[in-house]
Amino acid sequence: MIDIALIKENLDHFKKKLESKGYKGNLNDVVSKYESKNTIQVKLDEIKNLKNVLSKEIGTLAQKGESIEEKKKQSESLSNEIELLQNDFDVLKTELEEELFSIPNIPDKDVPEGADESSNLVLEEVIYKQSECGPDHVEIGELLQLLDSNAANKLSGSRFVVLKGKLAQLQRALIRFMLDEAASNGYEEYYVPYIVNSESLMGTGQLPKFADDQFSVGEGKYLIPTAEVPLTNIFRNEAISTKDIPIKMTAHTPCFRAEAGSYGKDTRGMIRQHQFEKIELVKFVHPSESEKALDELVSDASNILDKLELSYRKVVLCSGDLGFSAAKTIDLEVWLPSQKCFREISSCSNFRDFQTRRMNTKLTDGSTKTYPHTLNGSALAVGRTLLAVLENFYESGVGCLLYTSPSPRDISGSRMPSSA
């Protein structure tokens, strides 16, 4: 959430920044409601003070045995006025909060402007052994009899997958490898619920805007779209001591997404699923450290691709392609020979104080309070890593080779990849 006082003071600046992110709301109306709410608040405080004075006068008159009827009538009139004003205040407060929760974060000043992904900026390409073309991961998995699309469709419909044997073991090995990498970089591992309440999704920014992409299980509960939601919301309505930051958290979870806006896109295989595995990294840092923390987050994720010897590139997203809550995002895109292009495998974002304001998470040194900055990123999306390994290291008649160290490990044999 953006501080409404800042919006009021820098209205033209916020209009321009939010317009670059595709925001279509009326900031003038938001500021007008904010001013009206403040005006009512001042009036309420004045009348409540008058009523308190009147109550004391009534008490004094009563002690003296003098008439209090006129004063009581005045007090009742003030009570009625307070009730009406309080109702107006509550309505405005609710409307203002709803609008503020629907306003996206503004892009950082160094984020390139643009309407869509065509304006994204490639920062770096890292190339290893790279096939220019080849079969896709579904064909490879079915040839190896380790991926069963028909079974997944029978069980759950489209955008699901069944893995078995060595491929299921490889996925488990990748998860362990990624968690070990996170631990070596100072992240504390968490096990978190896979079902969260609406307040949690409001805190990180998935609600209210992206309600259609969430899997609701009823009674205000949802399946998590990413471990970012439970990890970050652990500190909702909490005060964090400056002595305890940076806080670095990680979790492996399944993630659930309705993919409401992607009908017909990537329906084959593991590119875009309703259920997928991911290792998430989350940071709480001092505001002065968040830019450096984003670079470190990207490095933590890209180092995994380096160790797996998968070709990738770093891409900074333009303003129009940024997520709702993000101030700046750097994607890692892995090379997929079957598509002859790079596809996203990690998205690392700096949210600044956008999420902590929504969650009412404070940073305190004992005397003053501010809002810490949050960051998160995937390290990595497990399914997309798995399919990238399949496509980049598949050799007909041999199987799929995964390099997690200088020595190759053959997934068609008994040895599995590890972080060693």
Report residues per predicted region.
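A translation/RNA-centric and nucleic-acid-associated enzymatic feature enriched
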Residues: 237, 247, 251-272, 282-284, ...
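TRNA-binding/sensing appendages of the translation machinery
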Residues: 77-216
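Hydrophobic alpha-helical segments, chiefly the membrane-spanning helices
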Residues: 414-420
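N-terminal alpha-helical targeting/anchoring segments
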Residues: 1-126
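A domain-level signal for the structural core that forms small-molecule/cofactor-binding pockets
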Residues: 187, 194-199, 227-243, 257, ...
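Residues forming anionic-ligand binding surfaces in small-molecule and nucleic-acid pockets
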Residues: 133-168, 172, 256-288, 359-376
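Conserved small/polar residues in nucleotide/adenosyl-binding loops
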Residues: 403-410
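Acidic, His- and aromatic-enriched active-site or binding-groove loops in soluble protein domains
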Residues: 208-225, 338-341
